[in-house]
């Protein structure tokens, strides 16, 4: 990524390059020995209470009454809460849900009430004693049906919800966001096409199924300050959203996020965490633990959005793509959360990694009475590409051009004009196509190993655009200890991807110290850790990494300025290598441990200069611009695109269905 490349050039070429080298993971020993703490491992003593949730058995219904009297009377029950206790709305982009339902349930599993008790068993018994009277409503179970004028409205009050400027809901419908792309003139381009294909594809909702279920523990002290421990990809977003909904200041809301046992997007934003906090507010002083069952994981927290996609594309006789028209109907579920933004991501990526002069795309996020949707690996790209790449194969066949060659003709090159009107940054996509085709000997055919089997080869391209807001920022700090070891503060989360190790490598390389001198301050704690937007969108190495490098360079600059003053030299003549400051002019050297906390003496015993070295850094992509809501055109829609090509050879047993890659 060009931004990381720029900062890397700022690192001294005399410093051993730790980037690209295999190093031991910082969290490896903890995890293989069982010493690492995940949310469910945390101990809170005998005062811990356990929470369970009363959930709707219906996909769509009005709530006529909730009777909690029997639950409250059960011995061992310490609190029962309902939506009447918490009237505020919550949502990342569109605030369309209450913490607990107040007047209507919108999916099977919608939370109605919460119980805190001295054991999980008693809490479960209390939940069963809560009596709810419903007025059943017709559910919306398909996004296409949800678009019909006679479909029931999942959110009749859509026009009253708070929404960010770049999300465009349509009150009076089930459309929570409509994103458009209008590049060129697709309507008039079809008559110029030598071949046209049209296809419809459907992708269902999918559960993430991380090994670790969702766990949250909340405690409210006597002053009203809230602490939340949880398996979270978004501790700062949780602090912001929950505090806002509950009407407390962010300084009174603290989120501590230990290691996460798999997230894949399901632990981003706010799902079940607000439930634990709401219940804890009714039993101040005592921690309340909510741990979801595997059954709850499947229908009460985020799932991947479903998609009904219509694709139409055409090319000229030489195989050059001329036009593309897409209609995406995303199954956003009962509440939008990330779904509305995924609609945008798919919209401004709707041509796939191909240059098409004429594109018309309408991407809709549609309310249904299905589970709430959120981010899952790829953020709308796998669903969209599943249909688009099959269409590319079909169009190549229709024009009698090899599928790999067809892709090489049309794939994005450096400088290509994208569907938003911006230019493609440097990309090696054409070379990727050639390399994967060569790797599987594309064009050759090998016979199957047995008569009942069939063998085939396939190729596909991909691209992905992060759909984060243009002002999603990162920050970091670097503190040098007395022995010159380094404590690195970051707000991004370690969810198994190796982030802490990568950040340590970048900090060590930028500062000029050995990798094993670096320790990352963990767990992430919003009270002490520097701000990080979220651990999503494959963004940490790029965004948080830039903040880390800037913090390390800031510390490095302080050290060199200090030594330059003491030695009466220019900082440009100094370097830090292997934990020592060296002068290329006088050939003097000095260990960092001798200066980074206590400084250096002035000549002739006239006092000291320097002091504790703490570097600060931040990063925000200031160059992302808005898009025209009617055309989707703009100067730069996203921070960067990731591109790639894949090829595979498979053998399928036609009798058993077994697939070998």
Region annotations inferred by a language model:
Residues 1-171, 196-199:
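Flexible, low-hydrophobicity surface segments
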Residues 1-33, 40, 49, 165, ...:
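Cofactor-centric catalytic regions
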Residues 76-79, 252, 318, 517:
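Glycine-centered tight turns that cap/initiate beta-strands
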Residues 216, 221-226, 231-256:
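A conserved hydrophobic secondary-structure block that centers on an alpha-helix together
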Residues 355-373, 521-528, 532:
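A glycine-rich, basic-preceded beta-loop-alpha segment at the flavin cofactor/substrate interface
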Residues 356, 372-384, 537:
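A short glycine-threonine-serine/GTX helix/turn-capping micro-motif
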């Amino acid at each position: 990524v060009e931004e990381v490349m720029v900062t890397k050039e700022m690192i001294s070429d005399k410093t051993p390059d730790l980037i690209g080298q295999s190093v031991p993971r910082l969290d490896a020993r903890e995890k293989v020995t069982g010493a690492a703490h995940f949310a469910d491992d945390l101990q809170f003593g005998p005062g811990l209470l356990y929470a369970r949730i009363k959930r709707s058995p219906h996909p769509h219904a009005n709530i006529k009454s909730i009777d909690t009297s029997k639950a409250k009377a059960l011995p061992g029950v310490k609190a029962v809460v309902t939506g009447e206790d918490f009237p505020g709305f919550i949502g990342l982009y569109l605030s369309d849900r209450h913490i607990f339902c107040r007047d209507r349930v919108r999916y099977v599993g919608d939370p109605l009430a919460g119980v805190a008790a001295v054991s999980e068993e008693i809490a479960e018994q209390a939940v069963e004693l809560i009596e709810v009277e419903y007025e059943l409503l017709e559910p919306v179970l398909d996004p296409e049906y949800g678009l019909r004028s006679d479909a029931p409205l999942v959110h009749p009050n859509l026009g009253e919800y708070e929404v960010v400027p770049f999300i465009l809901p349509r009150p009076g419908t089930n459309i929570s966001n409509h994103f458009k792309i209008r590049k060129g003139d697709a309507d008039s381009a079809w008559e110029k096409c030598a071949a046209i294909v049209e296809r419809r594809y459907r992708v269902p909702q999918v559960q993430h199924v991380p090994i670790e279920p969702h766990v949250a523990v909340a405690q409210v002290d006597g002053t009203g300050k809230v602490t939340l421990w949880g398996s979270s990809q978004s501790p700062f977003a949780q602090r912001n959203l929950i505090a806002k909904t509950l009407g407390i200041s962010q300084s009174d809301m603290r989120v501590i996020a230990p290691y996460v046992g798999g997230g894949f997007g399901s632990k981003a934003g706010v799902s079940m965490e607000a439930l634990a906090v709401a219940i804890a507010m009714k039993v101040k002083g005592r921690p309340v633990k909510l741990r979801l069952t595997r059954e709850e994981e499947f229908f009460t927290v985020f799932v991947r959005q479903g998609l009904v996609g219509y694709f139409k594309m055409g090319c000229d006789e030489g195989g050059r793509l001329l036009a593309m028209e897409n209609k995406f109907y995303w199954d956003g579920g009962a509440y939008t959360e990330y779904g509305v933004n995924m609609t945008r991501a798919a919209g401004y990526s709707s041509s796939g990694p191909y240059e098409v002069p004429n594109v018309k795309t309408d991407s809709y996020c549609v309310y249904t009475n299905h589970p709430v949707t959120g981010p899952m690996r790829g953020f709308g790209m796998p669903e969209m590409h599943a249909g688009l790449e099959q269409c590319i194969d079909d169009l190549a066949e229709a024009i009698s051009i090899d599928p790999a060659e067809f892709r090489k003709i049309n794939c994005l090159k450096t400088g290509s004009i994208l569907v938003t009107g911006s230019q493609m940054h440097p990309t090696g996509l054409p070379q990727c196509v050639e390399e994967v085709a060569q790797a599987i000997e594309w064009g050759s055919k090998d016979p199957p190993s047995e008569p009942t089997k069939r063998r085939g080869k396939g190729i596909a391209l991909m691209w992905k655009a992060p759909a984060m807001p243009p002002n999603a920022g990162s920050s970091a700090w670097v503190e040098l200890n007395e022995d010159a070891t380094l404590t690195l503060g970051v707000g991004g989360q370690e969810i198994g991807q190796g982030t802490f190790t990568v950040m340590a490598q970048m900090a060590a390389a930028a500062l000029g110290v050995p990798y094993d001198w670096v320790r990352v301050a963990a767990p992430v704690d919003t009270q002490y850790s520097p701000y990080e937007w979220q651990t999503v969108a494959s963004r940490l190495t790029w965004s948080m990494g830039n903040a880390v490098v800037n913090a390390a360079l800031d510390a490095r600059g302080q050290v060199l300025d200090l030594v330059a003053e003491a030695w009466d030299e220019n900082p440009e003549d100094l370097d830090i290598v292997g934990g020592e400051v060296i002068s290329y002019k006088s050939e003097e050297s000095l260990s960092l441990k001798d200066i980074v906390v206590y400084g250096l003496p002035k000549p002739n015993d006239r006092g000291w200069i320097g002091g504790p070295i703490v570097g600060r850094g931040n990063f925000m992509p200031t160059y992302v611009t808005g898009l025209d809501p009617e055309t989707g055109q703009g100067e730069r829609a996203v921070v960067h695109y990731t591109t790639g090509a894949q090829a595979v050879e498979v053998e399928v047993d036609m009798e058993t269905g077994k697939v070998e890659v």
